[in-house]
Amino acid sequence: MPSTYDIYKKLLLLASFLSASQAQQVGTSKAEVHPSLTWQTCTSGGSCTTVNGKVVVDANWRWVHNVDGYNNCYTGNTWDTTLCPDDETCASNCALEGADYSGTYGVTTSGNSLRLNFVTQASQKNIGSRLYLMEDDSTYKMFKLLNQEFTFDVDVSNLPCGLNGAVYFVSMDADGGMAKYPANKAGAKYGTGYCDSQCPRDLKFINGMANVEGWEPSANDANAGTGNHGSCCAEMDIWEANSISTAYTPHPCDTPGQVMCTGDSCGGTYSSDRYGGTCDPDGCDFNSYRQGNKTFYGPGMTVDTKSKITVVTQFLTNDGTASGTLSEIKRFYVQNGKVIPNSESTWSGVSGNSITTAYCNAQKTLFGDTDVFTKHGGMEGMGAALAEGMVLVLSLWDDHNSNMLWLDSNYPTDKPSTTPGVARGSCDISSGDPKDVEANDANAYVVYSNIKVGPIGSTFSGSTGGGSSSSTTATSKTTTTSATKTTTTTTKTTTTTSASSTSTGGAQHWAQCGGIGWTGPTTCVAPYTCQKQNDYYSQCL
């Protein structure tokens, strides 16, 4: 008789065969070659080092065909019922193919610049794209942003109403889910593992299995549909924008990392109960137009969308360390060498120019929005995701659900534009229909470039145009080392700051106590003093 150990070994072997037969497969027709994209990490001294990164297109955009041939598993917005009668069989029968980035998806890179075209006509018409920054060819780059700032340049001059060039972070797995879900044989190399705070149900594959069961083709999107399952995780929207409007928005979840949901319990855009899931689909947004300043962002405005914009986002903590609790998300812009603080909210009762718990509570109350932000953890919940590490997403898309009116027009459309929170941009409420923008704005595109990450105040420089009690001079020097082909940019900042008095009613140790746009306390509790780090951030030390 065979021993118990022999039976155990045979069972393990059988399990491995079953796992392979039911796995999400990889195609062999076209090699996957990731476009190169450089970016920089900076230090508190202002020295930035170039990193040779790459980008990968999301699995949802890829050709899915049978493993042994060239028959489509998915055509238009429907699955082949023979190849894909259920989730497991479909994953076994179908493979994700390598990508032709420029020819099929309209994605091109040059140095530190990434251009995404809106419509690309190849053998089929491609609409938009979603890409992820990679650590290497099989791993996404994970960013931990507490007590850090994230900076990039963007050109939105060719993004009209109805389009969204989005830069954001999501709590995907670094390997695309391969370790957690052995059925996933494609992994980050092929752009798998996507999730966000909408718990999207339009994904063709989740956790290594197809999402064919319960699939319903979209009524107004020839390329999409929804299945029984969704993929949830925390989301930090750094930049959702076109040439008319922009917003930045944290979206916490009960669990920061990726989890699969089922049916309407997913919540979000794809479910009948928007707030029925474990994530915050609305978030707490800062849109300058929605907050009352209608001349701050747009063509020819303070932040002029006819020209390239440098966007700076800072993630401040309560104690000024990476182990602290997220307390504030600040925004600056730089154009033509001038630093522009984010606009102030002009609504009575909703003050400030950054995202804080107080701002979010006041905004939700005034606008009458359902406060699921607090329900799912608020700033602390968002901070938990930032601490664990998140993947950078760079995308361009149109909106088959609400025509992007939530970003750039009046929304909801059945309320007067004078109602607080309804007016979000100057686009007409008839704008943004995907069939119109895809036909009339097919040549639209967005360019992202010059991505930098580092400690607060390390990734940008520029003049303030006056209004500061301190003088700041910034110079940059770029050198190239031939042996390593690494470019280093060094920024030296000289500041003169008057001492701040202490007070028992001042800011606590490590807290912010000054900077352009700061409206909080400017003194510190004894024995600490307010020490200037740069024109935009002073800290009690």
UniProtKB/Swiss-Prot annotation:
<dbReference type="Pfam" id="PF00840">
    <property type="entry name" value="Glyco_hydro_7"/>
</dbReference>
<feature type="region of interest" description="Disordered">
    <location>
        <begin position="459"/>
        <end position="507"/>
    </location>
</feature>
<keyword id="KW-0624">Polysaccharide degradation</keyword>
<keyword id="KW-0136">Cellulose degradation</keyword>
<feature type="compositionally biased region" description="Low complexity">
    <location>
        <begin position="469"/>
        <end position="506"/>
    </location>
</feature>
<dbReference type="InterPro" id="IPR035971">
    <property type="entry name" value="CBD_sf"/>
</dbReference>
<dbReference type="Pfam" id="PF00734">
    <property type="entry name" value="CBM_1"/>
</dbReference>
<feature type="active site" description="Nucleophile">
    <location>
        <position position="235"/>
    </location>
</feature>
<feature type="disulfide bond">
    <location>
        <begin position="513"/>
        <end position="530"/>
    </location>
</feature>
<dbReference type="InterPro" id="IPR037019">
    <property type="entry name" value="Glyco_hydro_7_sf"/>
</dbReference>
<dbReference type="GO" id="GO:0030248">
    <property type="term" value="F:cellulose binding"/>
</dbReference>
<feature type="domain" description="CBM1">
    <location>
        <begin position="505"/>
        <end position="541"/>
    </location>
</feature>
<feature type="disulfide bond">
    <location>
        <begin position="524"/>
        <end position="540"/>
    </location>
</feature>
<keyword id="KW-0325">Glycoprotein</keyword>
<keyword id="KW-0119">Carbohydrate metabolism</keyword>
<comment type="similarity">
    <text>Belongs to the glycosyl hydrolase 7 (cellulase C) family.</text>
</comment>
<feature type="glycosylation site" description="N-linked (GlcNAc...) asparagine">
    <location>
        <position position="293"/>
    </location>
</feature>
<feature type="signal peptide">
    <location>
        <begin position="1"/>
        <end position="23"/>
    </location>
</feature>
<dbReference type="InterPro" id="IPR001722">
    <property type="entry name" value="Glyco_hydro_7"/>
</dbReference>
<comment type="function">
    <text>The biological conversion of cellulose to glucose generally requires three types of hydrolytic enzymes: (1) Endoglucanases which cut internal beta-1,4-glucosidic bonds; (2) Exocellobiohydrolases that cut the disaccharide cellobiose from the non-reducing end of the cellulose polymer chain; (3) Beta-1,4-glucosidases which hydrolyze the cellobiose and other short cello-oligosaccharides to glucose.</text>
</comment>
<keyword id="KW-0378">Hydrolase</keyword>
<feature type="region of interest" description="Catalytic">
    <location>
        <begin position="24"/>
        <end position="458"/>
    </location>
</feature>
<protein>
    <recommendedName>
        <fullName>Probable 1,4-beta-D-glucan cellobiohydrolase B</fullName>
        <ecNumber>3.2.1.91</ecNumber>
    </recommendedName>
</protein>
<dbReference type="InterPro" id="IPR013320">
    <property type="entry name" value="ConA-like_dom_sf"/>
</dbReference>
<keyword id="KW-0732">Signal</keyword>
<feature type="active site" description="Proton donor">
    <location>
        <position position="240"/>
    </location>
</feature>
<keyword id="KW-0964">Secreted</keyword>
<feature type="region of interest" description="Ser/Thr-rich linker">
    <location>
        <begin position="459"/>
        <end position="505"/>
    </location>
</feature>
<keyword id="KW-0326">Glycosidase</keyword>
<dbReference type="GO" id="GO:0016162">
    <property type="term" value="F:cellulose 1,4-beta-cellobiosidase activity"/>
</dbReference>
<keyword id="KW-1015">Disulfide bond</keyword>
<dbReference type="InterPro" id="IPR000254">
    <property type="entry name" value="Cellulose-bd_dom_fun"/>
</dbReference>
<dbReference type="GO" id="GO:0005576">
    <property type="term" value="C:extracellular region"/>
</dbReference>
<dbReference type="GO" id="GO:0030245">
    <property type="term" value="P:cellulose catabolic process"/>
</dbReference>
<feature type="region of interest" description="Disordered">
    <location>
        <begin position="413"/>
        <end position="434"/>
    </location>
</feature>
